[in-house]
Each structure stands twice: as C-alpha cells, then as structure tokens.
C-alpha cells in the first residue's frame, strides 16, 4: 500500500485532481467528506460543535449551518482552532478505518486540506501538493463558488502559506493550466505512484 497525502490551497483544484486519480484507480479517503459525516445530525461531533459555538450554528432542520459556522471560525483563528480540535480527531479515526479496509497493493490518496497546517506530512509515504497562484485561487472562489472577495481572502489567509505547502511537497502539480493539461499531468503522476506502490520498502505498511 502506498499512502499519499494530497493537499492544496482552497481553490487550487485539489478536488479535481483527486477525482481524476480515482478514475485511474486510486482509493480516495476524502477528509472533507468525512468531516461532514462526523458532524451529521445525531453524532457526538455535532453535539460538541454546538456545545462550543451555541445553537446559532444549527440550521432549522437541526443540521450544521456550514456558512454560518464558517463565517465565525474563518474570521477568528482561536475559534478555528477550537473547531479543528473537535473535528480532526474524529476524521483521523474514520480515515484509519477506511485505510485498513483497502487492498494491500492499493494507492490510497488521503485528500487532506489542512495537511500542511497540522504537520501531517510524516503520516504519508509521499505528499502531492496541487498548486495555483493566489490570483487563480481568488478568481475560482469568487467566480465558481460564488464567494465574496472578502470571504475568499479570509479563507485563503486562514490556511498555510503557499511556501509552507510547497516545502512539504514530494510532487508539485501546477494547476494554473487548462483541464486537458491537468488530466495529462495527473496521468503522469498516477504512473509514478503505481510504480512506487510496487517498490519493496516504499510503503509504511
């Protein structure tokens, strides 16, 4: 098994890269998706979030009001740290369960937005960083996700710097390119990952 940490700044295109890797045959463990699952209605995770931030972060149907919570935590580093302390251990436990279920020769992609921020690089055999210029990130967040420029800049500022992400990268995937070129680059990276997965001693398993 080859454990790959995949990360990138918000708006860099990490989700597109993970989708393409899955098409090639990777096993994906998506931290964002798991983070939503562990705070679903009725979970201990959601109860802990409500205890920390109050019932104002709940939608009328009892689910987590993500935009409301986001507006609180991305404007206050201390509150973001509180949220991360609740969610990250739950995500880690579920991720380990999914990894254990994967085949012995699998390339397991851990899609982890905050890999650099939380010093998680040593957990993986190698780290792939999807990189885009800050201008590209901002454009995608405003144009494609409908964020205000202020909200987009706040979310970018809440993450690790571009330099910090690049410093932990074993492979950097430049995504200031059209989709067709990105698809070609992902194909090349996939071939490299499969080769590494079959090298004796490469995996931490």
Curated annotation (Swiss-Prot):
Enzyme Commission code(s) on record: 2.7.1.24
Keyword Zinc set for record: no
PANTHER family, per the entry: BIFUNCTIONAL COENZYME A SYNTHASE-RELATED (PTHR10695:SF46), DEPHOSPHO-COA KINASE-RELATED (PTHR10695)
SUPFAM superfamilies for the chain: P-loop containing nucleoside triphosphate hydrolases
Keywords from the named record: ATP-binding, Coenzyme A biosynthesis, Cytoplasm, Kinase, Nucleotide-binding, Transferase
Gene: coaE
Biological process annotations from GO: coenzyme A biosynthetic process
Binding annotation for ATP: 11-16
Organism name: Streptomyces avermitilis (strain ATCC 31267 / DSM 46492 / JCM 5070 / NBRC 14893 / NCIMB 12804 / NRRL 8165 / MA-4680)
Coiled coil region boundaries: none
InterPro entries attached to this UniProt entry: Depp_CoAkinase, P-loop_NTPase
HAMAP family attached to this UniProt entry: Dephospho_CoA_kinase (MF_00376)
Pathway(s) per entry: Cofactor biosynthesis; coenzyme A biosynthesis; CoA from (R)-pantothenate: step 5/5
Record flagged with keyword Cytoplasm: yes
Stated name of the protein: Dephospho-CoA kinase
Pfam families: CoaE (PF01121)
Major subcellular location class: cytoplasm
Domain DPCK residues, every copy: 3-204
An annotated Gene Ontology molecular function: ATP binding
Job description of the protein: Catalyzes the phosphorylation of the 3'-hydroxyl group of dephosphocoenzyme A to form coenzyme A.
Family annotation (CDD domains): DPCK
Enzymatic reactions: 3'-dephospho-CoA + ATP = ADP + CoA + H(+)
Subcellular location, record wording: Cytoplasm
GO cellular component: cytoplasm
Family the UniProt entry places it in: Belongs to the CoaE family.
Enzyme class: transferase
């Amino acid at each position: 098994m080859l454990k790959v940490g995949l990360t990138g700044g918000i708006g860099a295109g990490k989700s597109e890269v993970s989708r393409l890797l899955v098409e090639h045959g990777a096993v994906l463990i998506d931290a964002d998706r798991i983070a939503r699952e562990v705070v679903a209605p009725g979970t201990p995770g959601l109860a802990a979030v409500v205890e920390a931030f109050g019932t104002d972060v709940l939608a009328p149907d009892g689910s987590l009001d993500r935009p409301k919570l986001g507006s609180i935590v991305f404007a206050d580093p201390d509150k973001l740290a509180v949220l991360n302390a609740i969610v990250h251990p739950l995500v880690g436990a579920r991720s380990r369960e999914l990894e254990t279920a994967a085949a012995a020769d699998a390339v397991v992609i851990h899609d982890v937005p905050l890999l650099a921020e939380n010093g998680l690089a040593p957990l993986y055999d190698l780290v792939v960083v999807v990189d885009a210029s800050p201008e590209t990130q901002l454009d995608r967040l405003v144009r494609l996700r409908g964020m205000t420029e202020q909200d987009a800049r706040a979310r970018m500022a809440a993450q690790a710097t571009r330099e910090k992400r690049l410093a932990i990268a074993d492979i950097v995937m430049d995504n200031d390119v059209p989709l067709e070129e990105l698809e070609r680059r992902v194909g090349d990276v996939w071939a490299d990952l499969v080769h590494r997965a079959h090298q004796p001693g490469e995996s931490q398993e």
